[in-house]
């Protein structure tokens, strides 16, 4: 069984036991978070599509890590004008371990 869950403005396909990197959440390492914006539930014999969300469905996940992605370097350059600008960006993320998927009855 799998579900498509929305968090941080993005959609992720998850199943029990999977690890997923999502946009940074305000939670400490070891905390459990509940993701209740479930868009789709896929079972072996049926698919439940939410309008926009599946009522009563939620995903319980554990925060494994709060970290940053590797640095992305941005370099701006204008020829003949001696204009150069270099800066970097590291996007923070939260790594979740999916513990349980709760479905409506």
Swiss-Prot record:
It comes from the Bacteria. SUPFAM superfamilies: L21p-like. One of its GO terms (biological process) is translation. Keywords: Ribonucleoprotein, Ribosomal protein, RNA-binding, rRNA-binding. PROSITE patterns: RIBOSOMAL_L21 (PS01169). One of its GO terms (cellular component) is ribonucleoprotein complex. Transmembrane segments: none annotated. InterPro entries: bL21-like, bL21-like_sf, Ribosomal_bL21, Ribosomal_bL21_CS. GO terms for molecular function: rRNA binding; structural constituent of ribosome. The keyword Ribonucleoprotein applies. Pfam families: Ribosomal_L21p. Part of the 50S ribosomal subunit. Contacts protein L20. This protein binds to 23S rRNA in the presence of protein L20. Belongs to the bacterial ribosomal protein bL21 family. NCBIfam families: L21. This is Large ribosomal subunit protein bL21. It comes from Dictyoglomus turgidum (strain DSM 6724 / Z-1310). The gene is rplU.
């Amino acid at each position: 069984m799998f579900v498509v869950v929305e968090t941080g403005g993005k959609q992720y396909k998850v199943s029990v036991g999977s690890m997923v990197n999502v946009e940074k959440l305000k939670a400490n390492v070891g905390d459990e978070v509940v993701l209740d914006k479930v868009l789709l539930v896929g079972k072996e014999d049926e698919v439940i599509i939410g309008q926009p969300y599946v009522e009563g469905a939620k995903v319980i996940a554990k925060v494994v890590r709060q970290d940053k992605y590797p640095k992305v370097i941005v370099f701006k350059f204008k020829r003949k004008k001696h204009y150069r600008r270099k800066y970097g960006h590291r996007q923070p993320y939260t790594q979740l371990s999916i513990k349980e998927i709760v479905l409506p009855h």
